[in-house]
Amino acid sequence: METELMRIGVSLPDTLLGKFDEIIEKRGYSSRSEAIRDSIRSYISYNEWMGNIKGHHVGTIVIIYDHTQRGLSNVLTDIQHHYSHLIRSSIHIYPDREDCFEIVVLEGEGKEITELAEAIMALKGVKLSKLITTESNETDEPSIVI
């Protein structure tokens, strides 16, 4: 069965496209289109996994964001205060003049952890947001999901 391919257009900053092209060459993709398809499949798989986090979990959210984005720091703080019952610790560093790098350690119900992660991911100015969790269960060994 042959799948019909759809042509789409995407606008990207030069630096992002340059980095993507370096990865394409390093990984040996036959074309930019194949690399984009692979990236989209990975993105879909990750988001499907996020939709199925259930039960008690521990984990982290890694966030890189532009603190010069007007109001973003305040919104992030408000979101974290709303979910403060999940947050066990956080580390916040300043790698350069624009960006903030934050690691938030979480523990709680998987559904709420996912809600927190999705609220952060949706914000304009968040350059990277990655959730990593493991199920926390007293009777079983934890299973790490990345």
From Swiss-Prot:
Ni(2+) binds at H81, H92, Y94, C100. Pfam families: NikR_C (PF08753), RHH_1 (PF01402). Binds 1 nickel ion per subunit. GO terms for biological process: response to nickel cation. It comes from the Archaea. Its cofactor is Ni(2+). Keywords: DNA-binding, Metal-binding, Nickel, Transcription, Transcription regulation. SUPFAM superfamilies: ACT-like, Ribbon-helix-helix. InterPro entries: Acetolactate_synth/TF_NikR_C, ACT-like_dom_sf, Arc_rbn_hlx_hlx, CopG, CopG/NikR_regulator, Ni_resp_reg_NikR, Ribbon_hlx_hlx, TF_NikR_Ni-bd_C. One of its GO terms (molecular function) is DNA binding. Transcriptional regulator. NCBIfam families: PRK00630.1, PRK01002.1, PRK02967.1, PRK04460.1. Belongs to the transcriptional regulatory CopG/NikR family. This is Putative nickel-responsive regulator 1.
